[in-house]
Amino acid sequence: EGFDNVGLMVGDREKNITKILLALDCTEEVIKEAKEMGAELILTHHPLLFRKPSTITTDTLLGRKIISLIKNDINLYSAHTNWDSVKGGLNDTLVEILGFNEGIIMDKSPVDSQAGIGRVVELTKEMTVLEIINLIKSSLDVKNLRYAGDLNEVIKKIAIVNGSGQDFFGDAKKLGADLIITGDTTYHFVSDYKEMGLNILDIGHFNSEWPVLIKVSEKVKERLG
């Protein structure tokens, strides 16, 4: 996505890598863990450097992280919306974990027709909202989630957007989805689209990405040998 910042955030492109630590975010705890385990590379989903910092000092959390990475010779690489949208990435893997058929892309990439944000799947067997909630809880090990809609409504078509997906509520509705599964949502978006007949399952940003990231990491391990 044009607004995003992905790739090598901090480090040396020529560095030989023998151990990688996968994380959703580059926190100070993650950097400490990478140092203790001897990982030369931290691979995160969310970029540490989303916008250019005006200063890099120990006065700020961001500055401390960058300085710590450099001091400990740890590289940081982030794959965000590119990892969401690519074929076989987070969106597709979430669909796979939930046991649905391969979906169509909601918002296609202008540079790759097989990539894009969000997926819409047609169910081979109709399910109620409650049945889908139970499926999510068991498949992603989610204890609690927020929903808006009718638990007994029969669902035929589902939109799925990992992470913050409320900007795609309109696309989901246009594509005929009865329900959307996503992460961060806000009151007014949910209230309006519920009125328009869209059931909404907010499973949490972390829950919509971390279990999926673990699954994707298995594919990365296979590729790296």
Regions found by a protein language model. Name each.
Residues E1-G225:
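Active-site catalytic microenvironments in core metabolic enzymes, especially phosphate/sugar-handling
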